[in-house]
Amino acid sequence: MRPDGRKPAQLRPIKIIRDFNIYAEGSVLIEFGNTKVIVTASVEDKVPPFLKGTGQGWITAEYSMIPRASETRSLREVVRGSPSGRTHEIQRLIGRSLRAAVDLKKLGEKTIWIDCDVIQADGGTRVASITGAFIAVADACIKLTKQNLVKANPLKDYVAAISVGKVRNEIVLDLNYTEDSNAQVDMNLVMTGKGEFVEIGATGEENTFSQEDFNKMLEYGKSGIERLIKIQKEFIEGIPSIGHWERKNIKEFVYKE
C-alpha cells in the first residue's frame, strides 16, 4: 500500500489554474497532489549572444523553491550566493523539454523565459514544472501569433513529464516525497504528444535494477504522460500536423483518478 493509498500506476490529483499571474504572457499554478508550482512564460525581444543574427529564438528556464516549500526552512539561493547543482540540472531539463515542443526558427529572435517557483514541495517538482510550463508557453505562443509578432505559431507538439520509481520492490508512478526519499530506483520521463522521448533519466539509489523493472517503469511513465497530455488538451487545442493551436476558454481544471 502506498502512503497515500494510491494504486501503483495512479497519478495524484492534479489541479491547474490558468492565468495565475496577470502580467506574464502565459502562466499557471499547477498542483500534483501537495506539490504546487507557479509557472510563468515571459517573452523578450532579444536572444543570447550566440543566437544574434541567426533569426532563431531561444527558450530557457529558471527554477527555485521558496524558503518554506518543504518541511524545514531553507535559505534562498540568492542568499547562499549561487544556485545549487540540483537547481542547474532542473533548469536545464525544463529548458530542453520545452525547446522540444517549439520550432525556434518560427519563434524568431525572441526568448521565452520559463520561471518555475515551487511554493510547496512534496515530490515531482520538476515534472510538474515541465507539464505546467507547456500550457504557459503555449498561451504565450498563441498570444504572439494573434498579435502578428510571429509569422506562424512556433508550437510543434505537446510535452509533459512524470516521475516513476521502485519503492519497497514495487514499481510506482508519480512519487510523493516520502516515496521519493525511500526509492530504490528513481526515473524522470519527458515525452511529446507524438510519443517520442525528450528525456529518460533512471538512477539506482544504492541499488541496481533489471530490464524488467525498466520496461515496467517505462510502461507506467508513458501511460501517465498520455493522461497528462489529455489534461493539457483541456486548455490547449492542438493539431500539430497542420500547425493549428488554439487556447480553450477554460480557467481551471481538476483531475482525479
Swiss-Prot record:
Stored Pfam families: RNase_PH, RNase_PH_C
Q: What class of enzyme is it?
A: transferase
For this protein, the Enzyme Commission number is 2.7.7.56
Q: Name the catalysed reactions.
A: tRNA(n+1) + phosphate = tRNA(n) + a ribonucleoside 5'-diphosphate
Please give the CDD domains that the UniProt record associates with this protein: RNase_PH_bact
What are the GO MF terms of this UniProt record?
3'-5'-RNA exonuclease activity; tRNA binding; tRNA nucleotidyltransferase activity
Q: Identify the keywords attached in UniProt to this record, alphabetized.
A: Nucleotidyltransferase, RNA-binding, rRNA processing, Transferase, tRNA processing, tRNA-binding
Q: Name one GO biological process term.
A: rRNA processing
Chain sites annotated for binding phosphate: R86, G124, T125, R126
| Listed SUPFAM superfamilies | Ribonuclease PH domain 2-like, Ribosomal protein S5 domain 2-like
Question: Coiled coil: which residue ranges?
Answer: none
> Tell me, how does this one assemble?
Homohexameric ring arranged as a trimer of dimers.
What this chain does, per the record?
A: Phosphorolytic 3'-5' exoribonuclease that plays an important role in tRNA 3'-end maturation. Removes nucleotide residues following the 3'-CCA terminus of tRNAs; can also add nucleotides to the ends of RNA molecules by using nucleoside diphosphates as substrates, but this may not be physiologically important. Probably plays a role in initiation of 16S rRNA degradation (leading to ribosome degradation) during starvation.
Similarity annotation: Belongs to the RNase PH family.
The entry's protein name is Ribonuclease PH
